[in-house]
């Protein structure tokens, strides 16, 4: 039951407020309005006034009177200096709690005044000034709550003032941090672009506090700091950024080295995951290598334990999904730290072995989780995060958990197909319609992601092994990847796609080629009979000539050329290789194969030393195997496609190769290159009399003897 005394008190207050409102409505002069407003503010604070009363005050006053109060330069004798300004801001604070009034231009254009007000010194504890500062924050918060609020605050320069309010620990600095948190959550890149220096100083302060703090504020900072990290990974590039990372590491080490409650530990794991996503393990800047390696091992071990505890339960808790997703990022950091080659690795061999063991257990838990709930929860974003980490593990290690992985493959293929089909549907719609399509499902406006991309490196490994390869074929993976290949090709050179997405598409295309090459080598009969490979061959024939005209894609050119040449051996009798664009493909392939080696400025015995051309030398580590395989595959195609030898002559590849061998020092040509060129020259000599004549005219027999090309020498002798 309500307290009778409280009811009577409320009734008295309401009556008093009604009288004040009546006086306000009947006021004829500024002095009368001013006196009535003082009475109103004494009867009710802005946050205690209901919408109806607030509207009545606004109807009685409007914006004209508050504007005059804000810009008045004089106050009655004996009154506080900020009296009029304080009352004007109080009125606007009252109005700004109304969503309609908060977006009114007369409120929005006062943001600069609110910005200055929150940094007025209140050291003397002046109640009127403190109240004015609080009201200014109420105005900023009211504006922030509107749809355009963050943009309005940003465009009116609020961030430097909010940062200053926090740095100086002015009254209500907590509200400054609250508003900054909201702005950086909604508009992180724009905030950093507009106020980079101020946010740098703020992040430096927050990091220092996080490194030194011992109380509850440390855990609150762990929760806030991910929002204040710059959207682009610049911390490793600057001295101030590195100092921030040192302080963050110091604070995280203190937290994670102790036994804490879940609510205290989870924010620390999430902060570490944010740093891992941007910087891998490079963000760990401990005082020395020993501490750094221990800290890295500690984080990864903790993450693996959290993953196992959450996913090995018969009914995994959905409430833990956000922190487990963070732990996935930390485990992925551990995978990279254990597998990448470094001159000065952070982890020792024993540490790596220990971490590989716990990460394997965590991945086993993910497999168990996917087996239990995967088919039922395909719309759950957490499922994609789980598949991503499993893909990262399988990209490096397929020997462990092999049986479990093979059993899971049908689900993984189904999941990849589901995500891909949805991607195809949305890609064919106008962007506006596509967004509506996304909003109509449980993902909200977040695209579910590219499950195939996450699993492609694993598929490359698995397709090289017989048992999993048979499963992949039976589940229709080749046809799925052919469709995916087409989609990624479309993304690569689309005009309106983000650069990051195009880079990912290029990498996916390269990895797809690796999977297809495995199938071509291990399952030639299947490839020769499966219609999807005919479609793939058509796409390669169309795309390689186009790709050659674009700069900076030599690795992809190598993949397309070699894959197409390897497939041509198996599809030689298919009509696809007798279409008009087949010749254009082989011209492009010849261009790739023929521009790799050139004479250098260095000499040996008076002759230039053979070397790689500039563009090829930069990518040779990635493309050398593809180049040698491509030459071998091209040589095999010569006798299968009779028209190919004439194309070689028209391209001058044969003549240029013989000229190169004539001009360079034989000692500088390594045996692998000699073997590759001998195979090509021998096939051309056997298949075409015209090519044979050119070889003889260019001193082919002498070169064969000089370079130890016995097969070519014998061929020329037998066919003389």
UniProtKB/Swiss-Prot annotation:
Kindly state one GO CC term assigned in the UniProt record. postsynapse
Q: Which organism is it from?
A: Xenopus laevis (African clawed frog)
What is this protein identified as?
Neurochondrin
Places the protein is found: Cytoplasm, Cytosol; Cell projection, Dendrite; Postsynapse
GO annotation (BP), single = neuron projection development
Primary role: Probably involved in signal transduction, in the nervous system. Required for the spatial learning process. May also be involved in neurite outgrowth.
Family per UniProt?
Answer: Belongs to the neurochondrin family.
Which superkingdom? Eukaryota
Q: Which Pfam families would you find in this protein's record?
A: Neurochondrin
